[in-house]
């Protein structure tokens, strides 16, 4: 078996273990080692080829881990009876990637059988989509790049203890478990207009910066919608209203769930190789069902421009592309779509933008307040370490509903930030709230939220409570 076959074998671990055993047997018999008389240095091409084989292997291994987590833990896959068993040890099997390929083929076969045979105009549209180039758009308020773009999955961010705003929620993790993937919007790219063509995904503005890559991943997967929330929003939420003004009936038809034959949670999923074919076939299925004749004629027009094709695809669907674990590349483009607000910079821990905007103490106090209300411990400590904040400054911070003491002791608030405020005399541990929960104090909050660390901290600094029910 050659190196390439060995690295890509599903039994790679067995091969490695077997080799280890042979080496252990051999080592005691070795009495001396010397260089051969002639030693050929590997040329640059061989070194590069070897490096690419190793990189490809590690990329596949990481993808196997991400897919194994998704297909074994996501409750929706279990409900559909398409889940796989979790690995028996820490090593994920390449079978998880093979499972993706089988599911992709299943959804392609399902829609192909439904549509057979295709008309000439349908074949023309399908060919147009398959032969189109795609770009993938990730939006964020974070500063994700210098010379290299680095985007990490929510799971990797958590594992590294990075503090940032989350766009992954409990139900995503419970039902889909795709939190070890990086998410991208999908656009048609072979046109002369400036990228990105779209700045929202499923009605959501995910950030002021668009990071665009024009290369896919051999182990990525695509869904026609958000993988968890597979409902296409009503037409008035869509971004390009001037395009939609051309049509009437289809605007009433577009809001729907996109799913396979097993019900709403049966979300079609395609590997990278099949994704354009899947996108084209499902689009044809929608067009066939539509009663909007003008929309049909527009879609099947012989001179359909790439931008118009993108408008159609991101109206009928809103495709989402997913790359396992992490994207790290020098081949990207960063586009500033709009300005970033101070609150967005704070919640994204975007220190470059924070430093641009926080030019005096007044703005620093705003940033401090935003970091406390959004429970951004890292940014709060950063502001406190770079500005001399006084008790009078803290008193000047106003909130319509909450006292600063309440916010410092609210659910999931930072003990480090609270202790800094206490040590510097910026708050008194026994100050009673005047607004929400009037008459209570920080210790009452800590006890109510069962925050043992905060209770211990407040008692250490002499906190008391008059609440007889505690």
Swiss-Prot record:
Gene3D superfamilies reported in the protein's UniProt record: Ankyrin repeat-containing domain
Enzyme active site: 320
InterPro entries: Ankyrin_rpt-contain_sf, OspC1-4
Keyword hit for NAD: yes
Residues the UniProt record annotates as site (Important for catalytic activity): 138, 183, 206, 226
Record Pfam families: Shigella_OspC
GO biological process, one term: symbiont-mediated suppression of host calcium-mediated signal transduction
Keyword annotations from UniProtKB, A to Z: ANK repeat, Host nucleus, Lyase, NAD, Plasmid, Repeat, Secreted, Toxin, Virulence
Protein EC: 4.3.99.-
Predominant subcellular localization, coarse grouping: secreted
Function of the protein: ADP-riboxanase effector that mediates arginine ADP-riboxanation of host caspases. ADP-riboxanation of host apoptotic caspases (CASP3, CASP8 and CASP9) prevents their activation, thereby inhibiting host cell extrinsic and intrinsic apoptosis. Does not catalyze ADP-riboxanation of host CASP4/CASP11. Independently of its ADP-riboxanase activity, acts as an inhibitor of calcium signaling by inhibiting host calmodulin, preventing activation of the JAK-STAT signaling pathway in response to interferon-beta.
Family, per entry: Belongs to the OspC family.
Entry protein name: Arginine ADP-riboxanase OspC1
Protein source organism: Shigella flexneri
Phylogenetic classification of the source organism: Bacteria, Pseudomonadati, Pseudomonadota, Gammaproteobacteria, Enterobacterales
């Amino acid at each position: 078996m050659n190196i390439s076959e060995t690295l890509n074998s599903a039994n790679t671990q067995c091969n490695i273990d077997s080799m280890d055993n042979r080496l252990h047997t051999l080592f005691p018999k070795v009495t001396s080692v010397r260089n051969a008389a002639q030693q050929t240095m590997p040329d640059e091409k061989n070194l590069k080829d070897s490096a690419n084989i190793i990189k490809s292997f590690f990329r596949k291994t990481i993808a196997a881990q991400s897919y194994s987590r998704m297909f074994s833990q996501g409750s929706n896959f279990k409900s559909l009876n398409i889940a796989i068993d979790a690995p028996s040890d820490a090593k994920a099997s390449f079978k998880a990637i093979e499972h993706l390929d089988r599911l992709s083929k299943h959804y392609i076969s399902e829609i192909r059988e439904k549509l057979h045979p295709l008309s000439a105009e349908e074949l023309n549209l399908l060919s147009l989509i398959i032969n189109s180039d795609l770009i993938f758009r990730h939006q964020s308020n974070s500063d994700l790049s210098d010379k290299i773009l680095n985007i990490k999955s929510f799971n990797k961010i958590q594992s590294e203890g990075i503090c940032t705003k989350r766009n992954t929620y409990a139900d995503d993790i419970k039902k889909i478990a795709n939190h070890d993937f990086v998410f991208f919007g999908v656009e048609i790219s072979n046109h002369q207009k400036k990228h990105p063509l779209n700045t929202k995904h499923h009605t959501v503005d995910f950030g002021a910066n668009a990071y665009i890559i024009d290369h896919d991943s051999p182990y990525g997967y695509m869904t026609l919608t958000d993988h968890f929330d597979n409902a296409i929003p009503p037409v008035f939420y869509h971004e390009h209203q001037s395009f939609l003004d051309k049509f009437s009936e289809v605007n009433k038809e577009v809001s729907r769930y996109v799913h396979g034959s097993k019900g709403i949670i049966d979300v079609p999923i395609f590997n990278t190789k099949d994704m354009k074919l899947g996108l084209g076939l499902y689009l044809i299925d929608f067009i066939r069902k539509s009663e909007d004749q003008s929309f049909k004629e527009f879609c099947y027009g012989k001179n359909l421009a790439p931008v118009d094709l993108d408008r159609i695809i991101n109206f009928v669907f809103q495709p989402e592309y997913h790359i396992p674990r992490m994207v790290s590349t020098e081949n990207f483009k960063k586009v500033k779509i709009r300005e970033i607000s101070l609150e967005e910079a704070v919640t994204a821990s975007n220190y470059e933008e924070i430093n641009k905007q926080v030019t005096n103490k007044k703005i620093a106090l705003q940033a401090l307040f935003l970091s406390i209300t959004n429970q951004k411990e890292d940014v709060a400590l950063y502001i406190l370490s770079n500005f001399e904040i006084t008790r009078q400054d803290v008193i000047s911070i106003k909130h319509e509903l909450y006292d600063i003491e309440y916010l410092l002791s609210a659910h999931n608030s930072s003990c480090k930030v609270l202790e800094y405020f206490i040590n510097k005399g910026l708050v008194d541990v026994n100050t009673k709230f005047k607004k929400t929960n009037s008459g209570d104090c920080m210790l009452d909050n800590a006890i109510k939220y069962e925050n043992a660390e905060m209770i211990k901290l407040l008692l250490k600094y002499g906190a008391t409570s008059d609440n007889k029910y505690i």
